[in-house]
Regions:
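Intrinsically disordered, low-complexity Pro/Gly-rich regions
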Residues: 1-106
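Aromatic (tryptophan-biased) beta-strands that constitute blades/sheets of beta-rich domains
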Residues: 106-107, 129, 135-201, 205-232, ...
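Repeated scaffold domains used in trafficking and secretory/extracellular systems
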Residues: 186-195, 227-241, 280-295, 327-340, ...
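Structural motif
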Residues: 209-211, 252-264, 308-311, 352-359, ...
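Blade-loop segments of beta-propeller domains
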Residues: 220-263, 282
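Acidic, serine/threonine- and glycine-rich low-complexity intrinsically disordered segments
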Residues: 322-462, 468-470, 474-475
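Loop/turn-rich, solvent-exposed surfaces of beta-rich toroidal or solenoidal domains
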Residues: 435-473, 482-527
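Blade-level signature of beta-propeller repeat domains, shared across WD40, Kelch, NHL, RCC1
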Residues: 542-589
Length: 589
């Protein structure tokens, strides 16, 4: 498992045979998410049946999660990176996002022409009239619409660009495949959420282990065995490469295939060691360990939460710092957001009539610094960023697309006062958050007192059926859309991965005949600089496009790009000959 897999002649292996008919098309940005664990006290049902694994290279379906914990999380910027999501600035050295492609080959595009025509009728019209600066739709991009922009300032091979971040374009932005790793063998749909980059290793969760791989070769450097399956991982990492995970109390058995996710562990990713592991009990659970859903990190505080309770620990030793207070009016900490600060979604009231409060917390004591009461009609809320404090919610369940976002709330973390509420029409913007999870937003970034969002895909200006989108921003003080606009380019779509100082690192998802690209968007001018352009030969394209953006993690750091899955399942018999990947990496010279 640890050794890199050498591709046969022609790259990643022979392409899969053509399907007998058009595969089910992949949902666009904002399509309803797969069912996740009921959150915030919802009654637990029977474990869902695992989905059938689609054939390799086909659009992926929507797998249900494994019961007992939430769906894969995405992250904020940390030293040497973490996956896609609401990346807020952190210390420099540091998320599962986009819609996935509907079509992987030109033949599938033609087969789906009828659907595409329907989309074209309304596509691409809304944006021209919705821009906050009133400028025409064509303005404000250095990428143009060709999808062929070079590294550097709109032009020649990586020179120029912004000084607002650490990521610089190499002399040659064309990448080569670094390594690829096969998925672990499983018999059920299984979470493998979590990946990080240190100065020496790419670290990825397995099923019951955490593995460090050589950054360039993919050879196994170390492995941390665990008592049970990994069920969640922090998106944050300390300066010395320490982080936290959740894992189950035991490995699954025939008699008990689903174990409780009740163990918190501290990891040292520099040495490949499990520093500590702990379970806790709550006053309402008797002697039973609390089942956790999510875990986060702020400074040296690990905070884990779930429907049954929560706790905070010291990152280095695992010593318990505090537990949330359980009140007589049925209030509890639903989950935490970490990063530069620590915040909580605290829930009171009944399931049918909840009242949510957002609190900035002292990470060491758990004491509230400030509180903001969310408006009526908000059943769940997601913490997008903790400093500045930004929260997303689907107010009155008006989003209607499964994105769980109708509005963003910019809150003063010191006073708890609302700065501004930003309406984010789900039909226009493609960010998304978990349906019940607190720290699971993706496809957006926060920095420069702005929130950066991808627009929904719409009709391009070139050949028939081409699709594209943009990245735009809103001011977190005024709530107004700014003049920022970065075009993905004809037939490409793009979404933010993280902040890099004042710049935005974004991934440009490729069309069926090109490789993907990593770009740096200047935070001041919004000019794009290509940092990496992936190979366009079919075998590599098929491997890159096999990762659906909503269920994958994307890490870019200093000329290395890693794409990994957050969910795996047993392959279908018909797809046993198809190449499957847990991780694919690219690098520039």
């Amino acid at each position: 498992f640890g050794a890199p897999q050498d591709p046969p002649a022609g790259g990643f292996g022979a392409p899969p045979p053509p399907p007998p008919g058009p595969p089910q098309q992949q949902p666009d940005y904002g399509y309803p998410q797969p069912p996740t664990q009921p959150g915030y006290g919802f009654p637990q049902g029977q474990p869902p049946q695992p989905p059938t694994q689609p054939g390799y290279g086909f659009p992926q379906g929507q797998p249900p999660t494994q019961p007992g914990y939430g769906f894969p999380q995405q992250g904020q910027q940390q030293p040497y990176g973490y996956p896609t999501a609401p990346m807020q600035p952190a210390h420099q050295p540091p998320q599962q996002g986009g819609s996935g492609k509907k079509f992987s080959t030109q033949a599938q595009i033609i087969v789906a022409a009828v659907v595409a025509v329907a989309l074209i009728v309304g596509g691409g019209i809304w944006y021209a009239s919705s821009g906050g600066d009133g400028k025409k739709d064509e303005a404000g991009s250095s990428a143009g619409t060709s999808g062929e922009n070079k590294g550097g300032k709109g032009g020649e091979g990586g020179k120029g660009g912004s000084t607002g971040g650490k990521e610089k374009a190499p002399a040659n932005v064309d990448s080569t495949v670094g390594f690829q790793l096969p998925p672990p063998k499983v018999t059920d749909t299984t979470t493998v959420d979590g990946s990080w980059i240190t100065d020496k290793a790419y670290v990825k969760t397995g099923v019951t282990e955490i593995v460090g791989y050589d950054l360039d070769k993919g050879t196994k450097l170390w492995s941390i065995p665990l008592d049970g399956q990994v069920c969640a991982a922090s998106r944050h990492m300390s300066k010395d490469y320490r982080t936290a995970i959740l894992f189950e109390e035991a490995k699954p058995t025939k008699a008990k295939p689903y174990q409780q996710c009740n163990k918190v562990g501290g990891l040292d990713l520099a040495t490949g060691k499990l520093l500590w592991s702990k379970s806790v009990t709550a006053s309402t659970s008797g002697d039973r360990p609390v089942r956790f859903d999510e875990v986060t990190l702020s400074g040296t505080t690990v905070a884990a939460g779930g429907t049954g309770g929560g706790a905070a620990f010291k990152l280095d030793t695992g010593a318990e710092l505090w537990k949330p207070k359980v009140s007589t009016d049925n209030c509890y900490d639903a989950g935490y957001g970490g990063g530069e600060a620590l915040a909580v979604v605290r829930k009171c009231g009944s399931y049918d009539d909840p009242q949510l409060t957002i609190q900035a917390l002292n990470p060491t004591t758990g004491a509230p610094i400030s509180s903001y009461k969310m408006p009526a009609g908000v059943d769940y809320a997601s913490i997008v960023s903790t400093k500045p404090l930004v929260v997303a919610a689907d107010v009155g369940e008006t989003a209607g697309d499964g994105s769980s976002i109708s509005d963003f709330f910019s809150i003063d973390e010191a006073t708890g006062k609302l700065k501004i509420r930003i309406s984010a029409d789900a039909e226009k913007y493609a960010a998304r958050c978990g349906s019940t999870e607190v720290e699971q937003c993706q496809h957006l970034a926060v920095g420069n007192n702005r929130i950066y969002l991808p627009t929904e895909e719409h009709e391009g200006t070139g050949e028939s059926f081409s699709r594209t989108n943009e990245i735009v921003s809103f001011d977190l003080t005024t709530g107004k859309q700014t003049g920022d606009r970065a075009d993905a380019g004809e037939k490409f779509t793009m979404f933010p991965l993280r902040m890099d100082g004042k710049n935005i690192i974004a991934y440009r998802e490729p069309p069926y005949d090109k490789g993907g690209e990593i770009v740096s968007i200047d935070g001041s001018t919004f000019e794009q600089t290509v940092l990496m352009r992936n190979p366009s030969d079919k075998a590599v394209r098929d491997a890159e496009s096999s990762f659906t953006a909503d269920y994958s993690e994307f890490l870019y750091e200093q000329g290395r790009f890693f794409i990994s899955k957050t969910m795996i399942s047993a392959p279908r018999k018909s797809s046993l000959d198809d190449k499957e990947y847990l991780v694919v990496s690219f690098r520039t010279s």
